[in-house]
């Protein structure tokens, strides 16, 4: 099993490029199921989750390949007849596999999709997906770990539906289903993340009638058919945010190229609050970590609030602050599993339910640590960069689900980091 080995305490200097957003690429690739023909999705990161979705679509009868000479382009050939099943063997490692449910129901009128897997960061049920699809006319049964869904009328029908809670994949799944439904659909209390808007843009490029994607109310007028997709996904705001936090660590000076400043407003506000210097530069943002951070209080929230996917990374910065910070996690339960590993590095963190109190220390010291989920693994890499001595991050398969060769991106900044194949 691979591990990442870091010799920490070395200042980072220079520029780093952001890959395409995994969480935008996955729904856009799934949307290809809505239309027969040859599709092209650009700026796609080469990540484990993307490869898993490609295998899943291949199982359904699609041809999926990376572009020759351009590994960031994924080309798909979707046949007229698509197998409507997503088996457990492929779905178990990636929660986003459930995104095929909406397109399959909309185009084929039936689907059999295994209940999803993914990171172990608490309950992330798909009940909102199923309630909304039922409102569109689907009949759904859960049997033997599978969602079995059919459309008795032959075609989904438009509806007005209000999500009980904001859900990114739920919003995306229902958007795709409604794109081929008969009549008008209005979705309320929708997730407002940039990735939702990106999917809306991709659907419009396919000929769908979608308005409001990226706001809390989305309007969709169903059409009989869609054309093949050609779309470039947005940059990964979480990867960008991870590098921005790296730049804010004491003594560092990092320019993150390709990030969208508008997607980073909540994070940038906190980075400036801790004392980091953040400036817009051509094509990105520059962050300078000027001295020991100041403590801040952080509360995660759905977009445009502070992203839960950046909570662990920011905690690393606050572990070095001159004072005590408070982090409140409101989005997912059980998302402080990285805390025990940070404590192994010398951090002082106490967790009470959804609240973590972080008492800053002058420095961290390297040690072997074990990743528990995707963003926790990124946080441990950041901590290793800041710590004195050697840090080994184990179970980096979590990291590979969301970061594209992170060690190869950090090394040119001066980081002493390498992957040891196991």
Curated annotation (Swiss-Prot):
The protein's predominant localisation is: cytoplasm
Q: Where in the cell is it found?
A: Cytoplasm
- Annotated EC: 2.5.1.7
Give the top-rank taxon of the lineage listed in the UniProt record for this protein: Bacteria
Which UniProt keywords are present, listed alphabetically? Cell cycle, Cell division, Cell shape, Cell wall biogenesis/degradation, Cytoplasm, Peptidoglycan synthesis, Pyruvate, Transferase
Q: Which residues carry this modification: 2-(S-cysteinyl)pyruvic acid O-phosphothioketal?
A: 119
Its GO biological process annotations read: cell division; cell wall organization; peptidoglycan biosynthetic process; regulation of cell shape; UDP-N-acetylgalactosamine biosynthetic process
| Positions of the catalytic residues | 119
Q: Which reaction does it catalyse?
A: phosphoenolpyruvate + UDP-N-acetyl-alpha-D-glucosamine = UDP-N-acetyl-3-O-(1-carboxyvinyl)-alpha-D-glucosamine + phosphate
Query: Could you cite one Gene Ontology molecular function of this protein?
Result: UDP-N-acetylglucosamine 1-carboxyvinyltransferase activity
For the ligand (UDP-N-acetyl-alpha-D-glucosamine), the binding residues are 95, 124-128, 309, 331
Q: Where does phosphoenolpyruvate bind?
A: 22-23
- One GO cellular component term, please give it: cytoplasm
Q: Please give one Pfam family short name.
A: EPSP_synthase
Question: Which InterPro entries does UniProt cross-reference here?
Answer: Enolpyruvate_Tfrase_dom, Enolpyruvate_Tfrase_sf, MurA_subfamily, RNA3'P_cycl/enolpyr_Trfase_a/b, UDP_GlcNAc_COvinyl_MurA
Q: In which pathway does it act?
A: Cell wall biogenesis; peptidoglycan biosynthesis
Q: Which NCBIfam families match?
A: murA, PRK09369.1
Question: What family classification does the UniProt entry report for this protein?
Answer: Belongs to the EPSP synthase family. MurA subfamily.
Q: What does this protein do?
A: Cell wall formation. Adds enolpyruvyl to UDP-N-acetylglucosamine.
Q: Mind telling me what this protein is named?
A: UDP-N-acetylglucosamine 1-carboxyvinyltransferase
């Amino acid at each position: 099993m691979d591990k990442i080995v870091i010799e920490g305490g070395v200042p980072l200097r220079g520029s780093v490029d952001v890959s395409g957003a995994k969480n935008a690429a996955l729904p856009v690739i799934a949307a290809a199921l809505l239309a027969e023909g040859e599709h092209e999705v650009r700026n796609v990161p080469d990540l484990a989750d993307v490869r898993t979705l490609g295998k899943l679509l291949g199982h359904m009868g699609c041809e999926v390949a990376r572009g020759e000479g351009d590994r960031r382009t994924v080309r798909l050939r979707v046949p007229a007849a698509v197998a409507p099943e997503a088996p457990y063997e492929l779905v178990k490692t990636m929660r986003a596999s459930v995104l095929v449910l909406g397109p399959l129901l909309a185009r084929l009128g039936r689907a059999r999709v295994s209940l999803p897997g993914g990171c172990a960061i608490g309950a992330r049920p798909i009940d909102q997906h199923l309630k909304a699809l039922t409102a569109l006319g689907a009949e759904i049964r859960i049997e033997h770990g599978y969602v079995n869904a059919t459309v008795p009328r032959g075609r989904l029908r438009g509806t007005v539906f209000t999500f009980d809670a904001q859900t990114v994949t739920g919003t995306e799944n229902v958007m795709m289903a409604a794109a081929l439904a008969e009549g008008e659909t209005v979705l309320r209390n929708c997730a407002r993340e940039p990735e939702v808007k990106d999917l809306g843009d991709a659907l419009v490029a396919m000929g769908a009638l979608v308005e409001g994607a990226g706001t809390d109310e989305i309007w969709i007028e169903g059409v009989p058919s869609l054309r093949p997709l050609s779309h470039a996904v947005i940059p990964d705001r979480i990867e960008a945010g991870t590098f921005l936090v790296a730049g804010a660590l004491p003594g560092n000076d990092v320019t993150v190229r390709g990030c969208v400043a508008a997607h980073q407003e909540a994070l940038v506000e906190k980075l400036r609050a801790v004392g980091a210097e953040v400036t817009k530069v051509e094509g990105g943002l520059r962050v300078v970590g000027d001295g020991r951070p100041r403590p801040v209080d952080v509360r995660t929230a759905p977009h445009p609030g502070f992203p839960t996917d950046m909570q662990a990374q920011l905690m690393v910065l606050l572990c070095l602050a001159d004072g005590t910070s408070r982090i409140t996690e409101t989005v997912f339960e059980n998302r402080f599993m990285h805390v025990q590993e940070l404590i192994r590095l010398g951090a002082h963190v106490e967790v009470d339910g959804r609240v973590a109190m972080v008492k800053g220390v002058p420095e961290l010291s390297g040690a072997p640590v074990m990743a528990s989920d995707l963003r926790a693994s990124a946080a441990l890499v950041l901590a290793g960069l800041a710590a004195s001595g050697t840090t080994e991050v184990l179970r980096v398969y979590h990291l590979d689900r969301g970061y594209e060769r992170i060690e190869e991106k950090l090394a040119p900044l001066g980081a002493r980091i390498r992957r040891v194949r196991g």
